Amino acid sequence: MLLDRYLLSRFLGIFLNVSFVSVLLVSLYALLDFLVGFKEKRTDVALSYFLNILPLGFYYISFITLSISLILFLRKVFEKKMELTVQSFGISPLRFSLPVLLFSVFLSSTFLLGNEYAFPKLLGNLWFIEKNYKKKQEVKGFIKNFWFIKKENEVKTYYHVGNLNLSDGSLFNFYTMKVERKNLNPLEVLKVFSGVWKDKEIFIRSGEIYDFEKGKREKVFNKTFKLGLSIKEVELFSEKIDFLSLSEIFFLMQKSKKVGLNVDVYTGELFYRVMFSLSPVFISIFSLYLFFKHKVLSQVIPRFLVFIVILWLVILSPKILPQKANQPVLYSLIPIFLLILYSLKGVYDLRKGFRV
């Protein structure tokens, strides 16, 4: 349809211009951060830093980029009264908006693929660069709810540090899960309820060990366990949960449930990534709904800003509740469910149309 191509080209033009400005701002921030904050200003470090931060910057500010693009695009459409002309031919607002909605679905699909294949690796690279080349990156204080992974030969080990005092090494709620790298079969799970971490060993005051190869479970009291990992290496050379792909998070979610580990952190991270990736669809539906219902920019903007704040809180809730507030991730499902219902209602209203 000729109108579809026209609307899509106009919207893409605005979106690309806004994205260019956004990436330019991210580049400026990265340049200033590199010049001021890095202790080593080598060309290879700068290039690696820019190549990792730019795509991540586009991903994280797409929330704002898409919102601005939609408002600018729809303002022009409604100023020209194009929606009235189209509706006079019996074309619904949903059909009229189809090019924009399909683009938002494409953007969400790209973000989901990025969370599986690209963004976690870029975050890990960025973390490593900052920890090694930025100023004042010494490890100190406390580590709480820290998740990471270490790969060695044929074994991959997932770690969770519940609470670690770096000054004396006192440790609470520490878990490790060893799995085979090829088929991800679990080999061993270590649970340390309380202990002391010194050098590359942990003195376990109270804990448990599950040996999957022998099918054996053993209580551990006042015993030293060789970990092969020092406290300094935890932050300098490890991977956090943010650096795991969607498939790895899903795997850990399943395995953690089977062996009795805290599954809420993985479930919350999975929901957060999926919801953030789907945010372009939610933003597009709601902005189209508001413009077709109210038509006047002065009435649309306040409602749109309120929606953006609510959407942001809903998206963050599955990540924050288990990781920061120690609350069940199920609490976040209620606002997510309501958001999905409200979005479906918006699609229905767009399909039905609004009285002029």
UniProtKB/Swiss-Prot annotation:
One GO cellular component, as annotated: ATP-binding cassette (ABC) transporter complex
Where in or outside the cell?
Cell membrane
The way this protein sits in the membrane is described as: Multi-pass membrane protein
> Would the keyword Amino-acid biosynthesis be found if you checked this record's keyword annotation?
no
Membrane-spanning intervals of the chain = 7-29, 49-71, 91-113, 270-292, 299-316, 329-348
Q: Which domain of life is it from?
A: Bacteria
Q: Which InterPro entries match?
A: LptG/LptF_permease
Q: What are the UniProt keywords, alphabetically?
A: Cell membrane, Membrane, Transmembrane, Transmembrane helix
Share an example GO biological-process annotation for this protein: lipopolysaccharide transport
Could you identify this protein by its name? Answer: Uncharacterized protein aq_359
Can you name the source organism? Aquifex aeolicus (strain VF5)
